[in-house]
Amino acid sequence: MFAVIRTGGKQYRVAKDDVLEVERNGGEAGDKIDLEVLMLGGEGGTLKVGAPLVDGAKVKAEIVEHTRGPKITIFKKRRRQNYRRKNGHRQDLMLVKILDIAG
């Protein structure tokens, strides 16, 4: 059985025991969370599509750890204007393990 979930403005296709790297949205390591289910698929080709969510379907997950993404450099420049700006960014992420898909 698989599900398509939505978290952090992105969609992920997950199955039981998958480990995902998603954007951090609160909670501590070891906490259990429920994720929104957009689509649910099972054995035999059965498919439930939500509008926008599947009623009664839940994906239970556990936060494994908090991490940070790679450093991204932002550089802005306007030619002949002596205008240069350099910035950096690292996204806060968390590893999530899918425990159960019910629905």
Swiss-Prot record:
Gene Ontology CC: one annotated term: ribosome
Keyword Acyltransferase: no
One GO molecular-function entry: rRNA binding
UniProtKB keywords: Ribonucleoprotein, Ribosomal protein, RNA-binding, rRNA-binding
Entry keyword Ribonucleoprotein: yes
InterPro entries recorded: bL21-like, bL21-like_sf, Ribosomal_bL21
GO biological process entries: translation
Pfam families reported in the protein's UniProt record: Ribosomal_L21p (PF00829)
Assigned protein family: Belongs to the bacterial ribosomal protein bL21 family.
Functional summary from the UniProt entry: This protein binds to 23S rRNA in the presence of protein L20.
Binding partners and assembly: Part of the 50S ribosomal subunit. Contacts protein L20.
Protein's name according to its UniProt entry: Large ribosomal subunit protein bL21
Origin species: Parvibaculum lavamentivorans (strain DS-1 / DSM 13023 / NCIMB 13966)
Name of the gene: rplU
